[in-house]
């Protein structure tokens, strides 16, 4: 009986040690730069990827990401889905915007930061080449207060108002305009120089969002305004413990 207990304990210790070793080797740190005219985003990330097929080519993973975004002269529009499309839920993907419900918050200099949990999907065609997609799931956002100009579709074209706003403080991935806050996603191709070093090139699709200090009465008491960015992206990833 003692031999059985000893064997069980040894097996558990060995399994735990292997799991710890695999976790350490899978640490993947990334630095990404995304750019489009009058806007830029810098991302710092950490992730863990795990093969889910027999050949280990298809991988799922999780991680954390910091985003720092700067822009000039951007128009943030009414964010909530119930206003932009008159719908809630996944059907917002297939419904056109209701233009008369959409107001504009124009900001000369925008600055947003976020820390989010991230979901990763990747596929390796070979040891050198692969493709991937990732998306922020939930987290927090922060940044300084900004003054902007509010222009309403329900007001005369020559009428505007100055409004103060801050980045929406929390981020939640839902679906399309149901999303809340600052959320980043990337679609990319990967080239692996070796087991430790790789580069990604592709596109960043980024939501940033301001919450006004006061609700806008003529916009159905809405206080959330969103800007959607599409930028080119280049990143470097490094696995320091990979053998």
Predicted regions and their residues:
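Outer-membrane beta-barrel translocator/channel fold
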Residues: 61-121
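Extracellular loop and loop/strand-boundary signature of outer-membrane beta-barrel proteins
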Residues: 30-34, 47, 102-107, 170-175, ...
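Outer-membrane beta-barrel translocator domains and adjoining extracellular loop/strand segments
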Residues: 41-45, 72-81, 143-152, 156-159, ...
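Predominantly the C-terminal beta-signal and adjacent terminal strand-loop region
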Residues: 183-243
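Short glycine/proline- and aromatic-enriched beta-strand/turn motifs that initiate or cap beta-hairpins
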Residues: 20-84, 239-243
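Membrane-embedded beta-strand positions of outer-membrane beta-barrel proteins
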Residues: 29-33, 60-64, 117-119, 131-135, ...
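Residues that define the transmembrane beta-barrel architecture of outer-membrane proteins
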Residues: 25-27, 38-44, 58, 111-115, ...
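Residue-level signature of outer-membrane beta-barrel architecture
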Residues: 48-52, 119-125, 177, 191, ...
């Amino acid at each position: 009986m003692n031999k059985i207990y000893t064997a069980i304990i040894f097996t558990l210790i060995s399994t735990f040690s292997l799991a710890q070793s695999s976790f350490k080797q899978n640490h993947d740190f990334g630095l990404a730069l995304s750019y489009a005219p009058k806007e830029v985003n810098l991302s710092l990330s950490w992730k863990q990827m795990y093969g889910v097929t027999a050949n280990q080519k298809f991988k799922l993973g999780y991680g954390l990401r910091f985003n720092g975004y700067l822009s000039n002269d951007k128009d943030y529009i009414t964010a909530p889905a119930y206003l932009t499309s008159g719908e809630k839920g996944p059907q917002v993907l297939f419904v056109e915007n209701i233009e008369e419900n959409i107001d504009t918050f124009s900001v000369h200099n925008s600055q947003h930061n976020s820390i989010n949990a991230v979901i990763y999907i990747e596929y390796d065609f070979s040891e050198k080449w692969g493709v991937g997609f990732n998306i922020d799931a939930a987290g927090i956002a922060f940044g300084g207060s900004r003054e902007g100009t509010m222009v309403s579709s329900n007001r005369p074209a020559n009428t505007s108002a100055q409004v103060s706003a801050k980045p929406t403080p929390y981020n939640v991935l839902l679906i399309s305009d149901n999303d809340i806050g600052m959320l980043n996603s990337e679609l990319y191709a990967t080239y692996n120089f070796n087991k430790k070093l790789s580069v990604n090139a592709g596109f960043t699709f980024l939501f940033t969002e301001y919450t006004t200090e006061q609700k806008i009465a003529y916009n159905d008491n809405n206080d959330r305004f969103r800007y959607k960015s599409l930028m080119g992206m280049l990143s470097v990833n490094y696995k320091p413990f990979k053998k």
